[in-house]
Amino acid sequence: MAKEQIKVSEVKRTRQKGGAVVTVDEFLSLKRPKGDLILKVGREQVSVTSLDRIYWPEEKLTKFDLLSFYLHVADYIMPFLQDRPAILQRYPRGIKAPMFFQQDLDSAPEFIKTARLTNQEGRQLDYGVYSTTASLLHFVTLGTIEQHPWH
């Protein structure tokens, strides 16, 4: 299946939300942070929000814990995700709350690459593409717990 880059104007580009800018090492050294931060990953800055949101109630694991996990495994999983469009299975309120699938991106930061593809129903959709660790973390901060790349 051929993919083509879509025009920037097709996907609304968003600005980073407020918060202190921290490096990956500073982020990983935090103990139970609350609120929002901007995480500097390579050349990109990823807005990470609601870090204290509980994703797994029984274990009391938060969005911060999930982002930390993905930072630790990014070097191992990015080769398998690299340059593939993302089908986002989002749990924005944690695993006990309703989830939904998102394929068609309506907005994204400038550093998120996009691809316009035709889905199984014949509709053209604008997918976010896993291109860097920053893109992976952006999808995670949207509530994407599992990663589902388009094959």
Where are these regions (language model features)?
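Intrinsically disordered, low-complexity regulatory tails
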Residues: M1-D36, K40
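Active-site loop/lid in soluble adenylation, ligation, and acyl-transfer enzymes
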Residues: S29-K31, G35-L39, E44-H151
